[in-house]
Amino acid sequence: MKLLDKLKKEKKEEPKIIKKQGEEQKFSFRDALGNLKSAMLGKAADIREEYKNRTDHAMQSDEMQDLSVRLRLHKNKVRIRTAAILTVLLAVSVGFGIYHHVRVYHHYVLVSSEERAGDNATQYIFLKKGCTLKCNPNGVTCVNRENAVQWNTTFTMQNPVIDVCGTTVAVADQRGNDVYIFNEKGLVGNFKVEYTLTRIRVARQGVVAAVLEDGDVAWINVYDSKGNIIVKNKTSIGKAGYPLDMDISSDGLKMVVSFAGIQNKTLDSKVDFYNFSSVGKDQDNNLVKEISYDGTVIPEVRFMDSDYAIAFRDDGATIFCGKHVPEEKREITIEKEIVSTFYDESYFGIITENEQEENEHKYKMELYRENGSKCFQAYFDMEYTNIKICGEEIFLYNGTELMIYTTSGKLKYHAAYEKQISEVIPSDGLGKYVIITPDSVDIIKIG
């Protein structure tokens, strides 16, 4: 019975178990559908999120690109604006330069004036900016741009003559015996020569060449700054001729002398070159070159620098060049009468009377470089008593009138001055000049 009851019980429970299994299978299918739906919904959400992220990224990228474009446009605008400003500034600068170049000034403003009563014998030597020497028979004084005394040396001379090379100055008593050497810092040396001094030249390091007279004998000697004789050259005026002029190179190693004499009742001139280095030590009196010129006079000879020299003839100029033994390199022939010559270490000029029918001006000025190539020629009418070149400017003046040319040939300034002009010196500052008059030292600014 128990067994039968157990079987009946199991038989009754079996459909329940099957029903539960059927119910479990139904639940799993729904769950699967639910899971699939959830998965699809989740995927769609993920897709929407991804799309949103990509859209946001694209929007951010567009914003970055837009910002980059705006920055680039701003930079371009800045560049264009800067270029425009620079172009305007350049145009203004070029225009001012052209205006300044072509304009001729006829007016001046008096900047300052200082009295110099009783000082008419003083000569002014402009050495460099901020250093001017005042030389008279009683000594030499150096003043700065404010005219304050930097140093002074006293002496007594009857007729002081001056030669300048760079910032080295030789002051000698013409027809006397005293020689003083200065630079911008003060006295370098002084000594006495044994015969009557007629000419003196100085090199940068203080070496001095002097022409001395002793009856019918001329001595052309070279000294160091302390008076020690480097070369002693005795010449006979009757044989060699009279030394018209001489110069020493800036390095003190070469000397050029112009002689004039009469040979067979004919005027004879010659130019002698001396070398005091090892090149000329084995030559008689260190003479390394001699050139004769018949029928002409050579009143001036100059070293432009250590290698170039020029001989001013009465009918032109001859340019020499050579490191040790100068040779003739170029000859300039002037057909008209030479009125004046001027020079510095870089340029030399010749002024002649002008007789050209097509040009009615009275004078013709020609400027040349040290090698003889021409810089310019210009014509003018002003009567002048002094001419000199200083830096890149040429000064012509008389007692009441001043004219300034540039070395490019431009007339820069031409006007009368209210006082008598004794000397003109460049000053510090654009367009400023020192005008020395008999009773004042004036600083003017042209404009």
Q: Can you name each region flagged by the protein language model?
A:
Residues 1-58:
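N-terminal targeting leaders characterized by basic, low-complexity, disordered sequences
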Residues 81-97:
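Hydrophobic membrane-insertion alpha-helices, especially the h-region
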Residues 103-122, 144-157, 187-193, 231-233, ...:
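Aromatic (tryptophan-biased) beta-strands that constitute blades/sheets of beta-rich domains
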Residues 116-127, 155-167, 195-206, 239-248, ...:
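Repeated scaffold domains used in trafficking and secretory/extracellular systems
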